[in-house]
Amino acid sequence: MKQKHLQVFGTVQGVGFRYYTQRLANKYNILGTVQNVDDYVEIYAIGNDDDLEQFINAVTEGASPASHVTHYELEDTNVSEDFSDFKSI
């Protein structure tokens, strides 16, 4: 399982972005978290290569109808927490 850290910038707070991200995570069998941080949304995502790629593409194309992603930063990470599901915090 690979682990990714994603920071998503743009109109991503107050528009249902975390809710839709959680739905996408369930669709693509992704574990981890999504949360609002300052002026962006932070996502820790764990899954297999294909599922992660599809999930990240869907999220960065705008997870919710009212969101608008201007840019994002993606990096590999090694989260020590053992996730059993995907949560919005």
From Swiss-Prot:
Recorded catalytic activity of this chain's protein: an acyl phosphate + H2O = a carboxylate + phosphate + H(+)
The species this protein was found in: Staphylococcus haemolyticus (strain JCSC1435)
Lineage: Bacteria, Bacillati, Bacillota, Bacilli, Bacillales
Keyword Hydrolase: yes
EC number, as in UniProt: 3.6.1.7
Pfam families in the record: Acylphosphatase (PF00708)
Keywords tagged on the record: Hydrolase
PROSITE patterns: ACYLPHOSPHATASE_1, ACYLPHOSPHATASE_3
Cited Gene3D superfamilies: 3.30.70.100
Highest taxon of the lineage: Bacteria
Family per similarity comment: Belongs to the acylphosphatase family.
Top-level class of the enzyme under EC nomenclature: hydrolase
GO biological process, one term: protein maturation
InterPro entries, alphabetized: Acylphosphatase-like_dom, Acylphosphatase-like_dom_sf, Acylphosphatase_CS, Carbamoyltrans_HypF-like
PANTHER family: CARBAMOYLTRANSFERASE, CARBAMOYLTRANSFERASE HYPF
Name listed for the protein in its UniProt record: Acylphosphatase
Every Acylphosphatase-like domain range: 3-89
